[in-house]
Protein backbone atom coordinates (compact mmCIF):
# COMPACT_ATOMS: atom_id res chain seq x y z
CA UNK A 1 0.00 0.00 0.00
CA UNK A 2 1.27 3.47 -0.90
CA UNK A 3 1.92 5.87 1.99
CA UNK A 4 -0.49 8.30 0.26
CA UNK A 5 -3.29 5.75 0.77
CA UNK A 6 -2.46 5.01 4.43
CA UNK A 7 -5.11 7.36 5.90
CA UNK A 8 -7.45 7.60 2.87
CA UNK A 9 -8.87 10.86 1.49
CA UNK A 10 -11.07 12.43 -1.17
CA UNK A 11 -10.68 16.06 -2.25
CA UNK A 12 -12.28 18.04 -5.06
CA UNK A 13 -12.46 21.71 -6.04
CA UNK A 14 -14.79 23.10 -8.71
CA UNK A 15 -15.24 26.46 -10.40
CA UNK A 16 -18.58 28.26 -10.83
CA UNK A 17 -19.66 31.71 -11.98
CA UNK A 18 -17.51 34.10 -9.88
CA UNK A 19 -17.40 31.44 -7.15
CA UNK A 20 -15.76 28.14 -6.32
CA UNK A 21 -16.46 25.10 -4.16
CA UNK A 22 -14.05 22.82 -2.35
CA UNK A 23 -15.11 19.56 -0.70
CA UNK A 24 -13.54 16.65 1.16
CA UNK A 25 -14.55 13.48 2.96
CA UNK A 26 -14.42 13.22 6.78
CA UNK A 27 -12.83 9.82 7.38
CA UNK A 28 -9.48 9.33 9.07
CA UNK A 29 -8.39 5.73 8.91
CA UNK A 30 -5.34 3.54 9.31
CA UNK A 31 -5.64 1.42 6.20
CA UNK A 32 -9.04 -0.30 6.59
CA UNK A 33 -9.60 0.63 10.26
CA UNK A 34 -11.55 3.85 10.87
CA UNK A 35 -10.04 6.08 13.57
CA UNK A 36 -12.13 9.28 13.32
CA UNK A 37 -15.19 10.41 11.40
CA UNK A 38 -14.80 14.20 11.61
CA UNK A 39 -11.30 14.78 10.25
CA UNK A 40 -10.68 18.24 8.80
CA UNK A 41 -8.83 18.31 5.46
CA UNK A 42 -9.86 21.76 4.20
CA UNK A 43 -8.32 24.82 5.84
CA UNK A 44 -9.06 28.52 5.49
CA UNK A 45 -6.06 30.72 4.68
CA UNK A 46 -8.18 33.87 4.38
CA UNK A 47 -11.80 34.68 3.47
CA UNK A 48 -11.29 34.02 -0.26
CA UNK A 49 -8.61 31.33 -0.16
CA UNK A 50 -8.82 27.71 0.99
CA UNK A 51 -6.42 24.79 0.83
CA UNK A 52 -7.32 21.11 0.99
CA UNK A 53 -4.67 18.52 1.83
CA UNK A 54 -5.00 14.85 0.91
CA UNK A 55 -2.50 12.20 1.94
CA UNK A 56 -0.81 11.34 5.22
CA UNK A 57 -2.74 12.91 8.12
CA UNK A 58 0.34 13.95 10.13
CA UNK A 59 1.78 15.78 7.11
CA UNK A 60 -1.62 17.40 6.47
CA UNK A 61 -1.51 19.08 9.87
CA UNK A 62 2.19 19.96 9.69
CA UNK A 63 1.83 21.51 6.24
CA UNK A 64 -1.22 23.57 7.21
CA UNK A 65 0.72 25.05 10.15
CA UNK A 66 3.59 25.98 7.83
CA UNK A 67 1.21 27.54 5.27
CA UNK A 68 -0.61 29.56 7.97
CA UNK A 69 2.74 30.76 9.37
CA UNK A 70 4.02 31.86 5.94
CA UNK A 71 0.75 33.63 5.15
CA UNK A 72 0.83 35.52 8.47
CA UNK A 73 4.38 36.71 7.69
CA UNK A 74 3.22 37.83 4.24
CA UNK A 75 0.28 39.75 5.77
CA UNK A 76 2.57 41.52 8.25
CA UNK A 77 5.06 42.48 5.55
CA UNK A 78 2.68 43.36 2.71
CA UNK A 79 -0.39 44.48 4.71
CA UNK A 80 -2.72 42.57 2.38
CA UNK A 81 -3.92 39.03 1.77
CA UNK A 82 -2.10 36.68 -0.56
CA UNK A 83 -3.50 36.14 -4.05
CA UNK A 84 -4.29 32.49 -4.87
CA UNK A 85 -1.62 32.36 -7.60
CA UNK A 86 1.00 33.64 -5.15
CA UNK A 87 -0.10 31.14 -2.51
CA UNK A 88 0.11 28.29 -5.05
CA UNK A 89 3.72 29.29 -5.81
CA UNK A 90 4.48 29.40 -2.07
CA UNK A 91 3.04 25.90 -1.56
CA UNK A 92 4.93 24.60 -4.58
CA UNK A 93 8.23 26.05 -3.29
CA UNK A 94 7.66 24.65 0.22
CA UNK A 95 7.03 21.16 -1.16
CA UNK A 96 9.92 21.25 -3.66
CA UNK A 97 12.30 22.36 -0.89
CA UNK A 98 11.76 18.94 0.73
CA UNK A 99 11.83 16.96 -2.54
CA UNK A 100 14.40 14.39 -1.29
CA UNK A 101 12.24 13.54 1.74
CA UNK A 102 8.85 14.89 0.69
CA UNK A 103 5.67 15.59 2.61
CA UNK A 104 3.25 12.83 1.63
CA UNK A 105 0.47 15.26 0.66
CA UNK A 106 -1.27 16.41 -2.48
CA UNK A 107 -2.65 19.92 -1.95
CA UNK A 108 -5.72 21.36 -3.67
CA UNK A 109 -5.80 25.16 -3.67
CA UNK A 110 -8.94 27.17 -4.44
CA UNK A 111 -9.44 30.91 -4.20
CA UNK A 112 -10.86 34.09 -5.68
CA UNK A 113 -8.22 36.28 -7.31
CA UNK A 114 -8.34 39.76 -8.81
CA UNK A 115 -11.83 40.80 -9.99
CA UNK A 116 -13.12 37.78 -8.02
CA UNK A 117 -11.98 35.40 -10.74
CA UNK A 118 -11.90 31.81 -9.41
CA UNK A 119 -8.55 30.01 -9.34
CA UNK A 120 -8.04 26.30 -8.65
CA UNK A 121 -4.99 24.11 -8.81
CA UNK A 122 -3.52 20.92 -7.42
CA UNK A 123 0.01 19.61 -7.24
CA UNK A 124 1.94 16.47 -6.45
CA UNK A 125 4.03 15.85 -3.34
CA UNK A 126 7.04 17.73 -4.74
CA UNK A 127 5.12 20.79 -5.89
CA UNK A 128 4.52 20.26 -9.63
CA UNK A 129 1.47 22.43 -10.30
CA UNK A 130 -1.55 21.35 -12.32
CA UNK A 131 -3.84 24.26 -13.17
CA UNK A 132 -7.44 23.81 -14.32
CA UNK A 133 -10.41 25.95 -15.35
CA UNK A 134 -13.13 23.46 -14.37
CA UNK A 135 -12.24 21.09 -11.50
CA UNK A 136 -9.31 19.40 -9.77
CA UNK A 137 -9.25 16.23 -7.65
CA UNK A 138 -6.87 14.49 -5.24
CA UNK A 139 -6.78 11.58 -2.80
CA UNK A 140 -7.55 7.87 -2.88
CA UNK A 141 -10.95 8.51 -4.51
CA UNK A 142 -9.38 10.61 -7.32
CA UNK A 143 -10.19 8.19 -10.16
CA UNK A 144 -13.91 7.97 -9.40
CA UNK A 145 -13.98 11.74 -8.70
CA UNK A 146 -12.62 12.41 -12.21
CA UNK A 147 -15.42 10.37 -13.76
CA UNK A 148 -18.17 11.91 -11.61
CA UNK A 149 -16.94 15.47 -12.16
CA UNK A 150 -16.55 15.04 -15.91
CA UNK A 151 -20.12 13.80 -16.22
CA UNK A 152 -21.71 16.38 -13.86
CA UNK A 153 -19.68 19.57 -14.35
CA UNK A 154 -20.91 22.43 -16.51
CA UNK A 155 -19.46 25.95 -16.72
CA UNK A 156 -20.80 29.11 -14.99
CA UNK A 157 -22.88 27.46 -12.27
CA UNK A 158 -24.43 29.63 -9.56
CA UNK A 159 -23.39 28.87 -5.93
CA UNK A 160 -26.41 26.67 -5.07
CA UNK A 161 -26.13 24.58 -8.24
CA UNK A 162 -22.37 24.31 -7.72
CA UNK A 163 -22.94 23.03 -4.18
CA UNK A 164 -25.37 20.39 -5.44
CA UNK A 165 -23.01 19.27 -8.21
CA UNK A 166 -19.86 19.00 -6.08
CA UNK A 167 -21.78 17.23 -3.29
CA UNK A 168 -23.25 14.61 -5.63
CA UNK A 169 -19.84 14.06 -7.26
CA UNK A 170 -18.15 13.64 -3.86
CA UNK A 171 -20.79 11.33 -2.37
CA UNK A 172 -20.99 9.06 -5.40
CA UNK A 173 -17.18 8.83 -5.56
CA UNK A 174 -16.50 8.00 -1.92
CA UNK A 175 -19.07 5.19 -2.14
CA UNK A 176 -16.66 3.57 -4.63
CA UNK A 177 -13.57 3.95 -2.42
CA UNK A 178 -13.22 1.96 0.81
CA UNK A 179 -10.48 4.27 2.20
CA UNK A 180 -12.56 7.46 2.24
CA UNK A 181 -16.11 8.29 3.28
CA UNK A 182 -18.22 9.12 6.34
CA UNK A 183 -19.91 12.13 4.74
CA UNK A 184 -18.22 15.33 3.62
CA UNK A 185 -17.30 18.94 4.25
CA UNK A 186 -18.25 21.44 1.52
CA UNK A 187 -17.31 25.12 1.26
CA UNK A 188 -18.88 27.30 -1.43
CA UNK A 189 -17.12 30.66 -1.64
CA UNK A 190 -18.45 33.68 -3.54
CA UNK A 191 -17.25 37.33 -3.31
CA UNK A 192 -19.68 38.26 -0.51
CA UNK A 193 -20.32 35.02 1.38
CA UNK A 194 -18.97 31.62 2.39
CA UNK A 195 -21.39 28.70 2.69
CA UNK A 196 -20.09 25.82 4.81
CA UNK A 197 -22.09 22.60 4.94
CA UNK A 198 -21.59 19.09 6.27
CA UNK A 199 -22.87 16.18 4.20
CA UNK A 200 -24.12 12.94 5.65
CA UNK A 201 -23.19 9.97 3.51
CA UNK A 202 -23.06 6.21 4.00
CA UNK A 203 -21.58 5.54 7.41
CA UNK A 204 -19.64 2.38 6.56
Curated annotation (Swiss-Prot):
<protein>
    <recommendedName>
        <fullName>Proteasome subunit beta type-3</fullName>
    </recommendedName>
</protein>
<dbReference type="GO" id="GO:0005634">
    <property type="term" value="C:nucleus"/>
</dbReference>
<comment type="similarity">
    <text>Belongs to the peptidase T1B family.</text>
</comment>
<comment type="subunit">
    <text>The 26S proteasome consists of a 20S proteasome core and two 19S regulatory subunits. The 20S proteasome core is composed of 28 subunits that are arranged in four stacked rings, resulting in a barrel-shaped structure. The two end rings are each formed by seven alpha subunits, and the two central rings are each formed by seven beta subunits. The catalytic chamber with the active sites is on the inside of the barrel.</text>
</comment>
<dbReference type="InterPro" id="IPR001353">
    <property type="entry name" value="Proteasome_sua/b"/>
</dbReference>
<dbReference type="GO" id="GO:0019774">
    <property type="term" value="C:proteasome core complex, beta-subunit complex"/>
</dbReference>
<keyword id="KW-0539">Nucleus</keyword>
<dbReference type="Pfam" id="PF00227">
    <property type="entry name" value="Proteasome"/>
</dbReference>
<dbReference type="InterPro" id="IPR016050">
    <property type="entry name" value="Proteasome_bsu_CS"/>
</dbReference>
<dbReference type="InterPro" id="IPR033811">
    <property type="entry name" value="Proteasome_beta_3"/>
</dbReference>
<dbReference type="InterPro" id="IPR029055">
    <property type="entry name" value="Ntn_hydrolases_N"/>
</dbReference>
<dbReference type="GO" id="GO:0005737">
    <property type="term" value="C:cytoplasm"/>
</dbReference>
<dbReference type="GO" id="GO:0043161">
    <property type="term" value="P:proteasome-mediated ubiquitin-dependent protein catabolic process"/>
</dbReference>
<dbReference type="InterPro" id="IPR023333">
    <property type="entry name" value="Proteasome_suB-type"/>
</dbReference>
<comment type="function">
    <text>Non-catalytic component of the proteasome, a multicatalytic proteinase complex which is characterized by its ability to cleave peptides with Arg, Phe, Tyr, Leu, and Glu adjacent to the leaving group at neutral or slightly basic pH. The proteasome has an ATP-dependent proteolytic activity.</text>
</comment>
<keyword id="KW-0963">Cytoplasm</keyword>
<keyword id="KW-0647">Proteasome</keyword>
